[in-house]
Design a protein with these regions (language model features):
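Short, polar/charged alpha-helical segment
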Residues: 2, 21-32, 42-60
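Extracellular/periplasmic catalytic domains that process cell-envelope and extracellular macromolecules
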Residues: 30-32, 81-84, 128-132, 158-160, ...
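A ligand-binding cleft/hinge motif common to bilobed small-molecule-binding domains
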Residues: 95-100, 250, 257-278
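Periplasmic-binding protein-like
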Residues: 117-120, 131-135, 227-231, 274-299
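Mature extracytoplasmic/periplasmic domains
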Residues: 289, 293-354
């Protein structure tokens, strides 16, 4: 990563040059002069803001729907080539952001004062969190009227679920990889869940024991490794689209529906008489894996004031495209409204592991 340009930092008012108070009249006036704002967005729903933002501020949003990891690779390459066209990143690849992009000053945090009091410290630093999303397990509610057909992650290793668990390929989908990696990071919980499910301590497969002996970085087998081995032996089906997974699980015109690991907010895709899928809330040991989606200013952004204005907008009324069941606003008041409107548990009441 190239070093950030101090003159730009000073002009943009970021980092150590951020003013003590935010003059929004001045920011808005400067943003209108800039006239456009370019955003790399992990969500295609950014397109829903184009007209309303243009109407309110006279500023054009140029949005690109790009996966989080690819956003950062694109930004890095452009930055190193001296090409600076993007203003805002809307990104959920927290590990790369925290370990690479932020330390290299490739992106800059910005917290609109109007929402600061509604956020926890971890939602303001090191980056501004707009919402909390999750990867969870869905089942077909229409064809399982008595409730979820599984109650443990270990059920996915049973023969009856061979070839019947859908998920995005961890080799192609970074959030799917994060889901698996997070399970791997919690072996004690997985061991306890095994004992609850089968009534006896876990015994490791010979293949796992042999594999671990040949990996210098792993001391000994554990329950998470064993789960992953058995899960992969049970032939899960990798599909490229999280929406496709949801629909394949929820399709009511089938006899033997699969279960699927996909995005919690796909709940909005349910359609009466067509799709009926629901979350497995009481899955043992964990309901799912949660990850934040953050907003930030790109280093050397050509339109830093429009970037600030768009970030504030996406935290306030511009949150509406993401005001869907399963996407929890970081803002306390908005989340409270969501819980009531969507009849969902509060975010803090869900059994979720952070990536």
């Amino acid at each position: 990563f190239a070093n950030a340009d101090e003159a730009w930092q000073r002009a943009a008012g970021v980092g150590e040059f951020a003013p003590a108070t935010q003059d929004w009249a001045a920011i808005e006036a400067a943003a209108r002069e800039e006239g456009t704002v370019t955003i790399y967005s992990v969500s295609s729903r950014i397109a829903k803001l184009v007209d309303s933002f243009q109407e309110r501020y006279g500023i054009e949003i140029v949005g690109y729907d790009i996966a989080s990891d690819l956003q950062l690779e694109k930004l890095r390459r452009e930055h190193n080539a001296g090409v600076h066209t993007v203003d805002v990143l809307f990104n959920s690849e927290s590990s790369i952001l925290l370990n690479e992009a932020l330390p290299a000053k490739l992106v800059w945090n910005f917290i609109p004062e109007s929402v600061s009091d509604e956020l926890t410290e971890s939602e303001k630093s090191p980056l501004l969190i707009q919402r909390h999303s999750s990867r969870i397990v869905y089942y077909n509610t229409m064809l399982n009227p008595n409730g979820a057909p599984i109650n443990s992650l270990w059920d996915m290793t049973r023969e009856e679920w061979s070839g019947r668990t859908l998920l995005p390929s961890p080799l192609e989908d970074s959030l799917s990889a994060n889901f698996i990696q997070t399970i791997l990071a919690n072996p004690e919980d997985m061991a306890a869940a095994y004992q609850r499910e089968f009534g006896e301590p876990l015994s490791y497969s010979e293949a796992v024991i042999e594999a671990v002996e040949n990996i210098a970085t792993i001391d000994k087998p554990n329950a998470s490794i064993e789960w992953l081995y058995r899960f992969l032996q049970n032939e899960p089906v990798f599909q490229g689209s999280t929406t496709k997974i949801f629909k394949n699980v929820g399709d009511i015109a089938q006899e033997n529906p699969p279960i699927g690991i996909t995005t919690f907010s796909k709940l909005r895709k349910n359609k009466k008489g067509v799709y009926a899928a629901g979350p497995i809330y009481d899955l043992d040991p964990i309901f799912g894996v949660t990850y934040p989606t953050a907003l930030m200013i790109a280093d050397m952004a050509p339109n830093p004031n429009a970037a600030k204005l768009l970030i504030r907008y996406m935290m306030e009324e511009g949150f509406s495209p993401w005001n869907e069941p399963g996407d929890y606003s970081a803002r306390e008041s908005v989340e409270a409204e969501q819980v009531k409107e969507f009849d969902l548990p509060s975010f803090e009441d869900l059994k979720l592991w952070p990536v």
